[in-house]
Amino acid sequence: KLGCTRVEIGAQTIYDDVFDLVKRGHHTDATIHASQLLKDAAFKISYHMMPNLPGSNVERDIAMFKELFDNSAYRPDMIKVYPCMVVPFSELKLWYEQGRHRPYTDEELLEIIFRIKPNFPRYLRVTRLIRDIPATSIIGGSKVSNLRQVAQRMMHEKGIVCQCIRCREIREQPIDV
């Protein structure tokens, strides 16, 4: 009636121990339940995923993205990937200062991207690959605001191919007419 066709879910992770550590207030069963209700009602689903949350690591985050598309309980139509960043006035800032949380380096983030993007299904649209937070507000984490472009250029140079919708769009391809 109101024209809504897509719902975005701040899933962030699929790991209950990470949800507990960051005091999210729910577990992955809530993400699965919400996803099923939305799929049953014919909505498109977009997940917001957050690698580098406390309690995770590079290998675990890579496995998380694999599970998102191997497990039919998830399988969003779109995703936004927002690596966790340390910002002022947050509990995470205290953890960072105490050495309880270490943000990924740009190299670690790029490794995750290189390893997950080739496995993205053809139906998936990646609508964002890093949150647009001013570098002056980031205490810990990547300050590269064009991480998607950097990753795509490096993937092209290394011969790594992604099949997601955005990477296959004609607007970025040379046309032979």
What are these regions (language model features)?
Residues 1-46, 50-107:
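Conserved non-cysteine loop/helix-boundary elements of the Radical SAM core domain that shape
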Residues 100-177:
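C-terminal accessory regions of radical SAM enzymes
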